[in-house]
Amino acid sequence: MDQLLDVETLKKLSPEQQEQVISGVKQQAALANAQNLVTDISEKCTNKCITAPGSSLASGEKQCLQRCMDRFMESWNLVSQTLQKRLQEEMASSGGMGGGFGQGPSFS
């Protein structure tokens, strides 16, 4: 399902087709999320740690980059887990309806 579907069209799909659309959207979102993460880490850690660009990294720059990436990943994981938990709580409190598409998978 490469084309964009509006809500009315999605409602007309079978539950299996809805799950397929949702799965595709989740995969695209995960890929975009990973690309954004790599871009953010590269920009932030490079700007912070590499003070004198050259043909190789100094040992202090390597250590700084490693610590920066580790902290960034830890923070990103914490934020992701917190967001996922909140989405799951919202889904549970709203009766578990997946955005009006029935009992299919959620976007959490």
Curated annotation (Swiss-Prot):
Short sequence motif Twin CX3C motif: positions: 45-68
Topological relation to the membrane, as annotated: Peripheral membrane protein
Alphabetically ordered keywords of this record: Chaperone, Disulfide bond, Membrane, Metal-binding, Mitochondrion, Mitochondrion inner membrane, Protein transport, Translocation, Transport, Zinc
Keyword Kinase carried by entry: no
Gene Ontology terms: cellular component: mitochondrial inner membrane; mitochondrial intermembrane space protein transporter complex
Disulfide bonds: 45-68, 49-64
GO biological process, one term: protein insertion into mitochondrial inner membrane
Keyword Transmembrane helix: no
Biased composition (Gly residues): 95-108
Pfam families: zf-Tim10_DDP
Cell compartment(s), UniProt: Mitochondrion inner membrane
GO molecular function: metal ion binding
InterPro entries xref list: Tim10-like, Tim10-like_dom_sf
Annotated region (Disordered), positions in chain: 89-108
Assembly mode: Heterohexamer; composed of 3 copies of tim-8/ddp-1 and 3 copies of tin-13/tim-13, named soluble 70 kDa complex. Associates with the TIM22 complex, whose core is composed of tim-22.
Functional note: Mitochondrial intermembrane chaperone that participates in the import and insertion of some multi-pass transmembrane proteins into the mitochondrial inner membrane. Also required for the transfer of beta-barrel precursors from the TOM complex to the sorting and assembly machinery (SAM complex) of the outer membrane. Acts as a chaperone-like protein that protects the hydrophobic precursors from aggregation and guide them through the mitochondrial intermembrane space.
Family statement drawn from the similarity comment of this UniProt entry: Belongs to the small Tim family.
Entry's free-text remark on domains: The twin CX3C motif contains 4 conserved Cys residues that form 2 disulfide bonds in the mitochondrial intermembrane space. However, during the transit of tin-13/tim-13 from cytoplasm into mitochondrion, the Cys residues probably coordinate zinc, thereby preventing folding and allowing its transfer across mitochondrial outer membrane.
Protein name: Mitochondrial import inner membrane translocase subunit tim-13
Organism field: Caenorhabditis elegans
